[in-house]
UniProtKB/Swiss-Prot annotation:
Acts as a chaperone. This is Chaperone protein DnaK. CDD domains: ASKHA_NBD_HSP70_DnaK-like (cd10234). SUPFAM superfamilies: Actin-like ATPase domain, Heat shock protein 70kD (HSP70), C-terminal subdomain, Heat shock protein 70kD (HSP70), peptide-binding domain. It comes from Mycolicibacterium vanbaalenii (strain DSM 7251 / JCM 13017 / BCRC 16820 / KCTC 9966 / NRRL B-24157 / PYR-1) (Mycobacterium vanbaalenii). InterPro entries: ATPase_NBD (IPR043129), Chaperone_DnaK (IPR012725), Heat_shock_70_CS (IPR018181), HSP70_C_sf (IPR029048), HSP70_peptide-bd_sf (IPR029047), Hsp_70_fam (IPR013126). Induction: By stress conditions e.g. heat shock.
Length: 622
């Protein structure tokens, strides 16, 4: 049986590990290092360089060197090299191909299967893009696993049978995740996860670069941001300074011949950066990790004191300020020092590959979906079918109905996010279920099923229960979340909670009013057209007509109070109409079962049908 590897495809560095005799081993690359820079360069002679060789020549080949491409996964970002546009998947595939080659060289055999990790907070498009990168690299991706989950798997397998609660704080080069997991008796279960897909060591580097640019401009009057080669040298110096400040109180940044002045005289950059100054200019970045941490504790429903172990993952957690913050937030608990933050994710991925290949027994990995999933229903409401932090794989179904009479098709629009109003969430994709037989609104039953596989990738099916006709979409080719979208997604849900609740209530009231008007209008029409004429006086029907007209007028406006008032009045008149019919029927001594049972004429819908309607949306979504 072919071997499977575990790969941590990182923003700044990547790692590959494999099981040897049941134990995970991190594979050194062809340069002898256990981590490979996630950098790809296209040399002028046509050669493609990957890893450390690509990083080494970046200063002299700035425009043709690509780094931190993970931040663009799942988006429509491309980079043009020699008139060819490269997608993030293609660039990532180059890194994966190198890791694959290095592992094959180590094992002496071909490798086709891999488990690849992603940040827990990656959305569907980003996960799909990662899987595609693996396929481009010639790998059969057995599973996409969340990085904190892989880390917990690597950390917790040898910790005995006792159930433990573990907090994984994962701050890498470009992404941040925090997850709470329970481990015991071979089961690794994720309780909650949160994060920020655009927060990582790169941001700390950028702050040092900005600081150096400002310092140099202050002394020489020259703006280095206009010089690409100088900026590349600053970036490399900033990364080196950041690493040095993890063990030293200050560091010297010395860059000779950084640029020239107006008279072509060479200029030197020589600055001293202290740890205190570094922490001051990056304090706001550090503070951005607090909210996801608090969110995870809240979602898991536990107290900070219930955490048994804290595991730090990602090279950026080596910064003393990060370690101190984690210690502060966990009530003084010392983070575990027994894992290598650069390698633990790849080790966990290799273990999961072993589980899937049958090499590792009695281990069950239960992961969760990081964001809620649902569809847009009438009134622009987000009707959630799967809530965030639901264990995956999972499958959920709900039945919806049509919004208009004789509606021939429904547009199913799939969203991911936490806001009550669908448009405020991330549109993952849409598809149409056609061929619905002509029927009054509320009669067709459309069953919508969400199926999330173990990779966190979404499949959606819509089925007309009446005809058995169905349509399925596998959500892919997403545009990815922009930085603004990913940062705002959950915090917007909290900031706008009241506004969203109000919008949802308004949509619900409007839906109820429209439904009551429709059903009552239909019933009045049936009474007037009944054989032998209506059983109730015309003035009773006229009162109902008047109430219907008032309700329609209210619905044409935006005053929810007026709609509620008109709905109450219509309800009263509808009840009076039902009572009059009942009394007339009793007087005629007719069999009162069928006619009397539908006194208000407004309850023909199936009780199993969810009280929400799929919107027939002809307008192009912006």
């Amino acid at each position: 049986m072919a071997r499977a590897v575990g790969i941590d495809l990182g923003t700044t560095n990547s790692v590959v590990a494999v099981l040897e005799g049941g134990d995970p081993v991190v594979v050194a690359n062809s340069e002898g290092s256990r981590t490979t820079p996630s950098v790809v360069a296209f040399a002028r002679n046509g050669e493609v360089l990957v890893g450390q060789p690509a990083k080494n020549q970046a200063v002299t080949n700035v425009d043709r060197t690509i780094r931190s491409v993970k931040r663009h996964m799942g988006s429509d970002w491309t980079v043009k090299i020699d008139d060819k546009d490269y997608t993030p998947q293609e660039i990532s595939a180059r890194v994966l191909m190198k890791l694959k080659r290095d592992a094959e060289s180590y094992l002496g055999e071909d490798i086709t299967d891999a488990v690849i990790t992603v940040p827990a907070y990656f959305n569907d498009a980003q996960r799909q893009a990662t899987k595609e990168a693996g396929q481009i690299a010639g790998l059969n991706v057995l599973r996409i696993v969340n990085e904190p989950t892989a880390a917990a798997l690597a950390y917790g397998l040898d910790k005995g049978e006792k159930e433990q609660t573990i907090l994984v704080f994962d701050l890498g080069g470009g992404t941040f995740d925090v997850s709470l997991l329970e481990i015991g008796e071979g089961v690794v279960e994720v309780r909650a996860t949160s994060g920020d897909n655009h927060l990582g060591g790169d941001d700390w580097d950028d702050r040092i670069v900005e600081w150096l640019v400002d310092k140099f401009k202050g002394t020489s009057g020259i703006d280095l941001t206009k010089d690409k080669m100088a900026m590349q040298r600053l970036r490399e110096a900033a990364e080196k300074a950041k690493i040095e400040l993890s063990s030293s109180q200050s560091t010297s940044i010395n860059l000779p011949y950084i640029t020239v002045d107006a008279d072509k005289n060479p200029l030197f950059l020589d600055e001293q950066l202290t740890r205190a100054e570094f922490q001051r200019i990056t304090q706001d970045l550090l503070d951005r990790t607090r909210k996801p941490f608090q969110q995870v504790i809240k979602d898991a429903g536990i107290a900070v004191g219930d955490i048994d172990h804290v595991v730090l993952v990602g090279g950026s957690t080596r910064m003393p300020a990060v370690t101190e913050l984690v210690k502060e937030m966990t009530g003084g608990q010392e983070p575990n020092k027994g894992v290598n933050p650069d390698e633990v994710v790849a080790v966990g991925a290799a273990l999961q590959a072993g589980v899937l290949k049958g090499e590792v027994k009695d281990v069950l990995l239960l992961d969760v979906t990081p964001l809620s999933l649902g569809i847009e229903t009438k009134g622009g409401v987000m009707t959630k079918l799967i809530e965030r932090n639901t264990t995956i794989p999972t499958k959920r179904s709900e039945t919806f109905t049509t919004a208009d009479d004789n509606q021939p098709s429904v547009q199913i629009q799939v969203f991911q996010g936490e806001r009550e109003i669908a448009a405020h969430n991330k549109l993952l994709g849409s598809f149409e279920l056609t061929g619905i037989p002509p029927a009054p609104r509320g009669v067709p039953q459309i069953e919508v099923t969400f199926d999330i596989d173990a990779n966190g990738i979404v499949h959606v099916t819509a089925k007309d229960k009446g005809t058995g006709k169905e349509n399925t979409i596998k959500i892919q080719e997403g545009s990815g979340l922009s930085k603004e979208e990913i940062d705002r997604m959950i915090k917007d849900a909290e900031a706008h909670a009241d506004e969203d609740r109000q919008r949802r209530e308004e949509a619900d009231v409007r839906n109820q009013a429209e439904s009551l008007v429709y059903q009552t209008e239909k019933f009045v029409k049936e009474q007037r057209e009944a054989e032998g004429g209506s059983k109730v006086p015309e003035d009773t029907l006229t009162k109902v007509d008047s109430a219907i007209a008032d309700a329609k007028t209210a619905l044409a406006g935006t005053d929810i109070g007026a709609i509620k008032s008109a709905m109450e009045k219509l309800g009263e008149e509808s009840q009076a109409l039902g009572q009059a019919i009942y009394e007339a029927t009793q007087a005629e001594q007719a069999a009162g079962g069928a006619a009397g049972g539908d006194s208000a004429g407004a309850s023909g819908a199936n009780d199993d049908v969810v009280d929400a309607e799929v919107v027939e949306d002809d307008q192009e979504r912006k």
